[in-house]
């Protein structure tokens, strides 16, 4: 890959991760369920429930690890967006991009893709995408994004 010398992937709890150099990009799909019934599978519950990684702890670590020009991107349920953005703001990070994802055109967005940076002010870029058309087919956007992953 042309990125082999430039990309590092770490599979570890962010609470235990330390790196003095900092990162230009941090991507997360953090646990987000709060005060809800937990799955009996403890690994699955830890991956989904925010008590294993509260938003405050995530942003504390992101703020420490992100370079001054870096971008933090996250996938968040739409109902958690306000709290997530507020927590980012407490740690000096502002939303620069938001993309709301609808499963179909008739349904409300279920997920939001958020990008944060340290740069203050400016207007947030906001878009919306649909995964599946009303006829059940993948949307043009989703097909273009994922077509290389399908077996032909």
Q: Regions from the language model: what does each represent?
A:
Residues 21, 30-57, 61:
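Mobile active-site "lid"/loop adjacent to the S-adenosyl-L-methionine
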Residues 106-152:
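SAM/dcSAM-binding transferase cores
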Residues 1-24:
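S-adenosyl-L-methionine
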Residues 27:
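A conserved beta-strand element that flanks and buttresses the S-adenosyl-L-methionine
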Residues 1, 87-91, 119:
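Alpha-helical structural signal in soluble globular domains
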Residues 52-109, 113-114:
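Conserved Class I SAM-dependent methyltransferase catalytic core
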Residues 16-17, 32-34, 79-82:
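Short, catalytically relevant binding-site loops at active-site mouths
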